[in-house]
């Protein structure tokens, strides 16, 4: 159930993109204010990270699971506060760069901003705890369990890679390949969790 929740929250990271697309199609223009695009997409980082890192802690450090979840919950609260405070009281363009071209919006975190640093911490942690943790469990297991942990490790590694590239690169042909990587991730997690 935790992996399904994590996957659900991770898929909501594209809610800003989808909402903007629908806004352009229905109303003929982008979401207003533009910072709403970032809020709708990035509000889901914290719950996805907490649940994902709970799974990773269970795989790698079950005896320290509670401590890890508390630490990442605190970091997630800080992330959410920074996201909303920036949106409500300041200029969201200081933490997230928005580039509009025609009917699409691209958003990237501003390098060095605390929100960017927290995203990097979350992604590296998921890679280490979940990606390496799944590889570790796959090595310890046999048969179908080994295969499922192998698929989970591929999912986490590819997800971190394409999520990082998606937020770093500007739109272009390579973005299609990155988004297809997300589609591959959906299939990997499905087959890893399928009974």
Could you describe each region identified by the protein language model?
Residues 19, 114-121, 161-164:
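Alpha-helical transmembrane segments in eukaryotic/viral proteins
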Residues 2-78, 176-187:
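Individual alpha-helical transmembrane segments in multi-pass integral membrane proteins
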Residues 10-15, 76-86, 155-164:
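Aromatic-anchored segments of alpha-helical transmembrane domains
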Residues 125-195:
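C-terminal transmembrane-bundle signature of multipass membrane proteins
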Residues 29-38, 111-116, 139-146:
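Short juxtamembrane and helix-loop transition motifs at transmembrane-helix boundaries
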Residues 19-30, 85-93, 163-171:
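Juxtamembrane "helix-exit" motif on the non-cytosolic side of transmembrane helices
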Residues 81-130, 172-175:
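Extracellular-loop-to-transmembrane junctions of the mid-late helices
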Residues 55-57, 84-87, 186-195:
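Membrane-water interface at the C-terminal end of transmembrane alpha helices
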């Amino acid at each position: 159930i935790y992996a399904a929740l994590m996957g659900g929250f991770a898929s909501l990271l594209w809610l800003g993109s989808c909402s903007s697309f629908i806004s352009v199609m229905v109303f003929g223009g982008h979401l207003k204010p533009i910072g709403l695009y970032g809020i709708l997409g990035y509000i889901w980082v914290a719950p996805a990270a907490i649940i994902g890192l709970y799974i990773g802690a269970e795989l790698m450090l079950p005896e320290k699971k509670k401590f890890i979840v508390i630490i990442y919950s605190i970091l997630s609260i800080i992330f959410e506060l920074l996201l909303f405070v920036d949106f409500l009281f300041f200029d969201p363009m200081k933490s997230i760069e928005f580039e509009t071209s025609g009917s699409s919006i691209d958003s990237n975190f501003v390098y060095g901003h605390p929100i960017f640093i927290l995203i990097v911490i979350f992604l590296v942690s998921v890679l280490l705890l979940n990606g390496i943790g799944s590889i570790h469990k796959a090595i310890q297991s046999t048969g179908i369990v080994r295969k499922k942990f192998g698929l989970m490790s591929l999912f986490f590694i590819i997800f971190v890679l394409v999520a990082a590239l998606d937020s770093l690169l500007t739109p272009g042909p390579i973005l299609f390949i990155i988004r297809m990587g997300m589609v591959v991730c959906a299939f990997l997690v499905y087959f890893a969790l399928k009974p």
